[in-house]
Amino acid sequence: MKLFGTDGVRGKAGEFLDSFLAMRLAMAAGIYFKDKSITNNILVGKDTRRSGYMIENAIVSGLTSIGYNVIQIGPMPTPAIAFLTEDMRCDAGIMISASHNPYYDNGIKFFDAHGNKLSEDIEKKIEEIYFDDKLIQASKVDMEKIGQAKRIDDVIGRYIVSIKNSFPKDLTLKSLRVVLDVAHGAAYKVAPTVFKELGAEVIVMSDKPNGLNINENCGALHPANLAAEVKRLRADVGFAFDGDADRLVVVDEKGEVANGDSLLGVLALYLKEQGKLQSSVVATIMSNGALKEFLNKHGIELDTCNVGDKYVLEKLKANGGNFGGEQSGHIIFSDYAKTGDGLIAALQFSALMLSKKKSASSILGQVKPYPQLLTNLKIAEKKDLDKIKGLKELKKDLENKNINTLFRYSGTENLIRLLLEAKDIKLLEKEMKNVVEFFKKALNG
């Protein structure tokens, strides 16, 4: 049984991800980190899902039972956990979140002492420990050595300072009217505070979490309400975050939702113009062909990697780069953060608008993405794609029609993601129907 997916362990809370799994997984991770322990402290944060309380208590039980002390900081963005784990000199950090998923899902992500997401090799080692009954039992400590847990509520200030430090000192947001959609999620306190302290006129949406409304018709996956509000209020820009605030969607002053690759492109060029861009930009295999064209036109190389912001960061480290991201809105400025950070990306785009004295639409309009169609198809089983009869011929046929393809399984759900890209949208719509029918037969019998 495989526990880890694309971004940690994720599933339906109380079913796959129940208190037993959370406790045992925490013990397994704790056993792994014990060998490298310096402070014997592990940081635990969460988003605003109701199930977070259950999972947090289970994690604390697991860690303290093997002698670890736990620092609980409550609802905070995922990138805050990455930052605070290193800043507070903890052996590891744990974030309880299912990111953009509905409230009934939850997940567990791990960070090492430096705030980095774990490699697949380390995740595999933790999985092996998880299934080793003898090792789990042997790791339990005597009563006198059981760890302690304490809750700290004021660490939000540390993260706010670090975020504000990413914004140019010679600029102010005083001239900007900004609408923020915080998705009833982990950024509901942090995001408005940062923008207000930097001087912006701030209108906040979806900032009343009740444990069951995270990402519900709001945030990065549902930006329509934000778009309407930006237009109605004649705001300069709108920023939508997802439940754990590691991704960003931008809405321009006309109420148009920006393509994630357009955002990547203009931010990369902004870094280059400041002399801050190191090496090539990294995007994933799902990036739009227009992004590469735009970057190459401006003398910037583009490298690609697998889907997932941790793979973007790994590639950046290998290349000596400092900027990359995903079309979905995970954007990494590695000079400031170890993971995708929606707040940092929002501030950098604001700085770009202010320094250029241009509107959001005129800046984002520099990159004109090719039409793409993405279908998430629910499937019964995940067969090896290389062994599906007729798939090779299907891809060749699409290639002959100048259609780029990407077919990949979700790392966290029983889905296959079907992506087609071409200059002709009508052709895409026609061919997508054929592709969906092909995979329905191949994977659903």
UniProtKB/Swiss-Prot annotation:
Keyword Ion transport attached: no
**Keyword tags:** Isomerase, Magnesium, Metal-binding, Phosphoprotein
Q: Could you tell me which InterPro entries the record lists for this protein?
A: A-D-PHexomutase_a/b/a-I, A-D-PHexomutase_a/b/a-I/II/III, A-D-PHexomutase_a/b/a-II, A-D-PHexomutase_a/b/a-III, A-D-PHexomutase_C, A-D-PHexomutase_C_sf, A-D-PHexomutase_CS, Alpha-D-phosphohexomutase_SF
Q: Name one GO biological process term.
A: carbohydrate metabolic process
For this protein, the record's SUPFAM superfamilies field holds: Phosphoglucomutase, C-terminal domain, Phosphoglucomutase, first 3 domains
Q: Which residues form a coiled coil?
A: none
Positions with a binding annotation for Mg(2+)? S99, D242, D244, D246
UniProt KW Metal-binding keyword: yes
Q: What is its EC number?
A: 5.4.2.10
Q: Which cofactor does it need?
A: Mg(2+)
Q: Which domain of life is it from?
A: Bacteria
Residues in the active site?
A: S99
A Pfam family name for this chain?
A: PGM_PMM_I
Q: What class of enzyme is it?
A: isomerase
Reactions accelerated catalytically:
alpha-D-glucosamine 1-phosphate = D-glucosamine 6-phosphate
Into which family does the record put it? Belongs to the phosphohexose mutase family.
Q: What is this protein's name?
A: Phosphoglucosamine mutase
Instruction: Give the organism the record lists.
Output: Campylobacter jejuni subsp. jejuni serotype O:23/36 (strain 81-176)
What gene name is given for the protein in this entry?
Answer: glmM
